[in-house]
Amino acid sequence: MDFSQNHTKNSVESLQATRIFLFLSQIMRKTSQFILFLLLAVACGRTPSVDWTEGATEPDGRALHTLVLHDMPKGSRVWFQELFDGKTSVEGPSMNHYQGTSWYIDIPESGTVTLKYYGRPLPRRSWVPEAFVLQQQGRADTPMEVRYLFLEHPQTEKDEGCFASNYELQPADIIPQVKRVNYGTEPLELIESHPTGWFRITIGQGGEPKVECDDEDGAFYAQVTLSKLPRPLPPMTIEDWPDYAYRGFMLDVVRDFRTVDEVLEIIDLMASWKLNTLHFHIADDESWCLEIKDFPELTEFGAHHALPDWNLQETCALKPSANGKIGNTSFYTAEEYQRILRYAWDRRIRVIPEFDTPGHSRASIKAMQAYERRTGDSSFRLQDSTDTSRYWSAQDFTDNVLSVYLSSVYKFYGVVFDEVIRLHKEAGVPLPAIHIGGDEVPDGAWSGRDRHDMKEIFINGMLDLAEARGIRLAGWEDIVKGLKPETQERLKNSLYFINVWNTEGIEGFPVVLSPAAYTYLDLAYSDDLNEIGLSWAGYVDERKTFALNPNDYKGDIIGVQAQLWSSQLRSFEDATYQMLPKGLGVAERGWNGGYLEPFETAFNRFYSIIVAREMPVWERKGYVFKKR
């Protein structure tokens, strides 16, 4: 409204006051209506919610669980996440498996819906159905409140004697433990040859340290050692070096994403343990976590999560992972990835990205289907649309395997490899290898074609890419098994390492020990119901990781690695809890391959150092960790 100069000042002020009054009246009226709506919703119980009740284990080993859905709209659908366990409905509408951990229930009538179903007994409380979301046509998806009712279970008795921390520590007792120390001013007897990473620290009467080393790794490890020694420093000489050239940590950011800052904190922990390789698991079924500029759908589609549409199609994003998060953006831009690379390299840590193939490839398959829909370009297609294979993967997917006989698969990964090489080169950081996964290709994939021929085609196709670019590959042990002799020999020339559980039957390949029963940090600490984690390979605590003895294995062992898979994680706090303190056992075995004294004595010393010198640091930094 335009006011001319003929209007008086009073009329202008009066009109402005009237407008303000009307505006405030509207706000108050709408606020009152909203509050009234909330009060009515609460009073009438119209907010859909969930009650889940744990059932007792029956003689046949199953448990009858109960799921009650309150105030459900007719014709709606409820989604939730849970590990697949062959549920059998007994009462109420059926529970339908979609893909992976995703389930849905179609609601036939409004009101309260009760379901009873047989499933497995609950081994730990973190395995409950979770992330319930109400889906209605034409409306936004709505997370639902969930209440859990658990049975009373007897508590597992804790054997605290197994974790004594009464060893009398010396000033140089740190983790990893130093190999040679002499207190006083007498020098150590010098070793004739210096391994990579070797250093010597001499501390005189005045407490000033003198550092000797042969390379940048040794200089950094000497710095880490000095930062851990308690003050004041007594006169002493320390001489130390790593037993294994490869000391790794695998971080899965696909199933529960870690922010850049969280990754940097994990790198700091790795550096304090003198680990030197971050195996970065950034592409799998559940997500593709690295920006590739030529294929924006990899992250615009493959790193976003939403419920499938009403026709069970993933049209704009991938289905949720086990954590149930929807609408999240879970990937690293090229610049963020390079920031991680530089931060790690400053701490003498190399980064090896993993793109899991040819199984575990659902995110890339679905994303490139979206790319083809947008562009009409089928030359990067990853899955044959005419393939009628029927299979069920270890993680309960039926559509996650590359059609390795398509040349377009290798054209796609050529672009990916080129981008990764460029990012490392521009960051000024070496690229030791690209990890191609190779594990858990389900039986039934590539139906109608010889499975062994398909593996030969895949390995040779990836080797073509690597050799043309002068890079090396890495993979899980599956990639070397069942190959023709000529393919094995070719692979040896381009292979940096394979991650193995057991070296039996694997000869002539560089091996990084990664046995699940000793190095999978996502396995629960114990059978305590309140612990998070899986248990398919037993339980893993700091005693178990420390008990790994690489000397018990045959073969060309170049190192050891801890694995932190994230299907059971829901936060950074969960991640640090599963890492601390049991990750230190693997770090110790990478630096010091074995233990010379009796196990209980060696572990008592090791755990005493953790309690006295590691845990106070974690407390100050606010990390969540396992306390006893």
Question: What does each model-found stretch correspond to?
Answer:
Residues G45-D60, R124-E239, L473-P485, K492-S494, ...:
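Acidic, contiguous N-terminal accessory segments
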Residues K74-M95, A131:
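Short acidic, flexible loop segments centered on an aromatic residue
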Residues S393, F397-L495:
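Active-site neighborhood of glycoside hydrolase catalytic domains
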Residues R62-D71:
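Short, well-ordered beta-strand segments enriched in hydrophobic/aromatic residues
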Residues F37-G45:
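Hydrophobic h-region of N-terminal signal peptides that target proteins for export
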Residues I105-S126, E130:
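Low-complexity, intrinsically disordered segments enriched in Ser/Thr together with acidic residues
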Residues D478-Y496, W501-R628:
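Flexible, acidic glycine-rich loops studded with aromatic residues
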Residues H153-Q155, G204-N400, S408, F417-R422, ...:
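Feature activates predominantly on carbohydrate-active enzymes
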